[in-house]
Amino acid sequence: MSTLRTEYLENVAPKLQEEFGYSNAMQIPRLSKVVLNMGLGEAIQNNKILEGAVDELTLISGQKPVVTKAKKSIAAFKLREGMPIGVTATLRRDRMYDFLNKLVNVTLPRVRDFRGISPKAFDGRGNYTLGIREQIIFPEINYDRIDKVKGLNITIVTTAKNDEEGRRLLTLLGMPFRK
Protein backbone atom coordinates (compact mmCIF):
# COMPACT_ATOMS: atom_id res chain seq x y z
CA MET A 1 0.00 0.00 0.00
CA SER A 2 1.35 3.44 -0.88
CA THR A 3 2.34 5.95 1.78
CA LEU A 4 -0.30 8.49 0.72
CA ARG A 5 -3.06 5.86 0.94
CA THR A 6 -1.89 4.88 4.43
CA GLU A 7 -1.86 8.57 5.39
CA TYR A 8 -5.44 8.92 4.08
CA LEU A 9 -6.76 5.88 5.95
CA GLU A 10 -5.01 6.61 9.26
CA ASN A 11 -5.12 10.42 9.53
CA VAL A 12 -7.11 12.21 6.81
CA ALA A 13 -10.34 10.16 6.82
CA PRO A 14 -10.89 10.35 10.61
CA LYS A 15 -10.13 14.10 10.56
CA LEU A 16 -12.62 14.70 7.72
CA GLN A 17 -15.27 12.61 9.50
CA GLU A 18 -14.83 14.70 12.63
CA GLU A 19 -14.75 18.06 10.79
CA PHE A 20 -17.81 17.53 8.61
CA GLY A 21 -19.71 15.31 11.07
CA TYR A 22 -20.29 12.30 8.81
CA SER A 23 -22.31 9.55 10.49
CA ASN A 24 -21.24 6.90 7.98
CA ALA A 25 -17.67 6.07 6.87
CA MET A 26 -18.84 5.85 3.23
CA GLN A 27 -19.75 9.57 3.29
CA ILE A 28 -16.12 10.57 3.82
CA PRO A 29 -14.68 12.08 0.60
CA ARG A 30 -11.94 10.03 -1.05
CA LEU A 31 -9.97 10.08 -4.27
CA SER A 32 -11.55 8.05 -7.06
CA LYS A 33 -9.17 8.67 -10.00
CA VAL A 34 -6.59 10.97 -11.54
CA VAL A 35 -6.89 11.70 -15.26
CA LEU A 36 -3.85 12.94 -17.21
CA ASN A 37 -4.66 14.51 -20.58
CA MET A 38 -2.50 16.00 -23.33
CA GLY A 39 -4.36 17.80 -26.10
CA LEU A 40 -2.26 17.85 -29.26
CA GLY A 41 -3.75 19.96 -32.01
CA GLU A 42 -0.39 19.87 -33.86
CA ALA A 43 -0.70 16.08 -34.22
CA ILE A 44 -2.91 16.68 -37.29
CA GLN A 45 0.11 17.69 -39.40
CA ASN A 46 2.89 15.80 -37.61
CA ASN A 47 2.35 12.22 -36.40
CA LYS A 48 5.73 12.18 -34.59
CA ILE A 49 4.39 14.62 -31.99
CA LEU A 50 1.72 12.07 -31.06
CA GLU A 51 4.30 9.28 -30.67
CA GLY A 52 6.45 11.52 -28.46
CA ALA A 53 3.44 12.43 -26.32
CA VAL A 54 2.51 8.75 -25.86
CA ASP A 55 6.07 7.96 -24.73
CA GLU A 56 6.19 10.93 -22.34
CA LEU A 57 2.78 10.24 -20.79
CA THR A 58 3.80 6.59 -20.37
CA LEU A 59 6.87 7.71 -18.40
CA ILE A 60 4.89 10.22 -16.32
CA SER A 61 1.92 7.96 -15.49
CA GLY A 62 3.52 4.52 -15.42
CA GLN A 63 0.94 3.07 -17.80
CA LYS A 64 0.22 3.23 -21.52
CA PRO A 65 -2.11 6.13 -22.41
CA VAL A 66 -5.07 5.94 -24.79
CA VAL A 67 -4.92 7.97 -28.01
CA THR A 68 -8.02 10.18 -28.19
CA LYS A 69 -9.61 10.78 -31.58
CA ALA A 70 -11.66 13.68 -32.95
CA LYS A 71 -15.43 13.24 -32.56
CA LYS A 72 -16.35 15.69 -35.33
CA SER A 73 -14.76 17.05 -38.48
CA ILE A 74 -13.86 20.74 -38.37
CA ALA A 75 -12.84 22.17 -41.74
CA ALA A 76 -11.26 25.33 -40.31
CA PHE A 77 -8.75 23.22 -38.36
CA LYS A 78 -8.27 20.72 -41.24
CA LEU A 79 -9.56 18.08 -38.85
CA ARG A 80 -11.42 14.92 -39.87
CA GLU A 81 -13.50 12.67 -37.66
CA GLY A 82 -11.38 9.89 -36.17
CA MET A 83 -8.03 11.70 -36.47
CA PRO A 84 -5.79 11.35 -33.37
CA ILE A 85 -5.70 14.66 -31.46
CA GLY A 86 -4.52 13.79 -27.95
CA VAL A 87 -3.54 11.21 -25.35
CA THR A 88 -5.08 10.46 -21.98
CA ALA A 89 -4.31 8.15 -19.06
CA THR A 90 -6.57 7.34 -16.11
CA LEU A 91 -4.86 6.35 -12.86
CA ARG A 92 -6.68 4.50 -10.10
CA ARG A 93 -5.82 2.78 -6.79
CA ASP A 94 -2.11 2.54 -5.91
CA ARG A 95 -0.85 4.17 -9.13
CA MET A 96 -3.10 7.15 -8.40
CA TYR A 97 -1.75 7.55 -4.85
CA ASP A 98 1.86 7.08 -6.00
CA PHE A 99 1.40 9.69 -8.76
CA LEU A 100 -0.17 12.24 -6.38
CA ASN A 101 2.58 11.67 -3.83
CA LYS A 102 5.20 12.26 -6.53
CA LEU A 103 3.30 15.31 -7.86
CA VAL A 104 3.07 17.01 -4.46
CA ASN A 105 6.52 16.16 -3.09
CA VAL A 106 8.77 16.09 -6.16
CA THR A 107 7.21 17.61 -9.29
CA LEU A 108 5.43 20.78 -8.11
CA PRO A 109 8.44 22.04 -6.10
CA ARG A 110 10.46 21.90 -9.36
CA VAL A 111 8.23 24.55 -10.99
CA ARG A 112 9.97 27.93 -11.32
CA ASP A 113 8.61 30.64 -8.98
CA PHE A 114 6.20 28.16 -7.40
CA ARG A 115 3.99 29.77 -4.77
CA GLY A 116 1.29 27.11 -4.57
CA ILE A 117 -1.54 26.01 -6.83
CA SER A 118 -4.74 27.97 -7.33
CA PRO A 119 -7.51 27.09 -4.86
CA LYS A 120 -10.14 28.24 -7.40
CA ALA A 121 -9.82 25.44 -9.98
CA PHE A 122 -12.57 23.27 -8.50
CA ASP A 123 -15.59 22.40 -10.66
CA GLY A 124 -18.39 22.73 -8.09
CA ARG A 125 -18.51 19.00 -7.37
CA GLY A 126 -15.23 18.63 -5.46
CA ASN A 127 -13.02 17.73 -8.44
CA TYR A 128 -9.80 19.65 -9.08
CA THR A 129 -8.08 20.35 -12.41
CA LEU A 130 -4.48 21.49 -12.61
CA GLY A 131 -2.85 22.69 -15.82
CA ILE A 132 0.87 22.09 -16.29
CA ARG A 133 2.51 24.22 -18.99
CA GLU A 134 5.59 22.08 -19.61
CA GLN A 135 6.15 18.36 -19.15
CA ILE A 136 9.84 18.84 -18.29
CA ILE A 137 9.04 19.45 -14.60
CA PHE A 138 8.49 15.70 -14.19
CA PRO A 139 11.69 13.91 -13.11
CA GLU A 140 11.08 11.00 -15.55
CA ILE A 141 11.30 13.26 -18.60
CA ASN A 142 14.81 13.61 -20.02
CA TYR A 143 15.21 17.24 -21.13
CA ASP A 144 17.55 16.33 -24.01
CA ARG A 145 15.20 13.78 -25.57
CA ILE A 146 12.05 15.92 -25.90
CA ASP A 147 11.22 17.36 -29.31
CA LYS A 148 8.65 19.94 -28.18
CA VAL A 149 7.51 21.36 -24.84
CA LYS A 150 3.93 20.19 -24.28
CA GLY A 151 1.54 20.91 -21.45
CA LEU A 152 -0.93 18.58 -19.80
CA ASN A 153 -4.04 18.70 -17.66
CA ILE A 154 -4.28 16.75 -14.41
CA THR A 155 -7.81 16.20 -13.11
CA ILE A 156 -8.18 14.83 -9.58
CA VAL A 157 -11.63 13.27 -9.23
CA THR A 158 -12.98 12.88 -5.68
CA THR A 159 -16.22 11.63 -4.15
CA ALA A 160 -16.68 14.97 -2.34
CA LYS A 161 -20.12 16.54 -2.67
CA ASN A 162 -18.88 20.14 -2.95
CA ASP A 163 -15.73 22.21 -3.40
CA GLU A 164 -15.21 22.85 0.31
CA GLU A 165 -14.99 19.11 1.09
CA GLY A 166 -12.77 18.46 -1.94
CA ARG A 167 -10.43 21.33 -1.04
CA ARG A 168 -10.13 20.11 2.56
CA LEU A 169 -9.41 16.53 1.39
CA LEU A 170 -6.64 17.66 -0.96
CA THR A 171 -5.20 20.06 1.63
CA LEU A 172 -4.97 17.26 4.20
CA LEU A 173 -3.31 15.05 1.57
CA GLY A 174 -0.61 17.72 1.17
CA MET A 175 -1.64 19.72 -1.92
CA PRO A 176 0.12 23.11 -1.68
CA PHE A 177 -2.75 25.57 -2.26
CA ARG A 178 -1.99 29.28 -2.54
CA LYS A 179 -3.14 31.30 0.46
From Swiss-Prot:
GO CC field: ribonucleoprotein complex; ribosome
Entry annotated with the keyword rRNA-binding: yes
Domain of life per record: Bacteria
Entry-linked InterPro entries: Ribosomal_uL5 (IPR002132), Ribosomal_uL5_bac-type (IPR020930), Ribosomal_uL5_C (IPR031309), Ribosomal_uL5_CS (IPR020929), Ribosomal_uL5_dom_sf (IPR022803), Ribosomal_uL5_N (IPR031310)
Pfam families: Ribosomal_L5 (PF00281), Ribosomal_L5_C (PF00673)
Gene3D superfamilies: 3.30.1440.10
GO BP terms in the entry: translation
Keywords from the UniProt entry: Ribonucleoprotein, Ribosomal protein, RNA-binding, rRNA-binding, tRNA-binding
Keyword rRNA-binding among UniProt keywords: yes
Molecular function as annotated in GO: rRNA binding; structural constituent of ribosome; tRNA binding
Annotated NCBIfam families: PRK00010.1
Function: This is one of the proteins that bind and probably mediate the attachment of the 5S RNA into the large ribosomal subunit, where it forms part of the central protuberance. In the 70S ribosome it contacts protein S13 of the 30S subunit (bridge B1b), connecting the 2 subunits; this bridge is implicated in subunit movement. Contacts the P site tRNA; the 5S rRNA and some of its associated proteins might help stabilize positioning of ribosome-bound tRNAs.
PANTHER family: 60S RIBOSOMAL PROTEIN L11-RELATED
Entry's family note: Belongs to the universal ribosomal protein uL5 family.
Quaternary structure note: Part of the 50S ribosomal subunit; part of the 5S rRNA/L5/L18/L25 subcomplex. Contacts the 5S rRNA and the P site tRNA. Forms a bridge to the 30S subunit in the 70S ribosome.
Protein name according to UniProt: Large ribosomal subunit protein uL5
Organism: Desulfatibacillum aliphaticivorans
The gene coding this protein: rplE
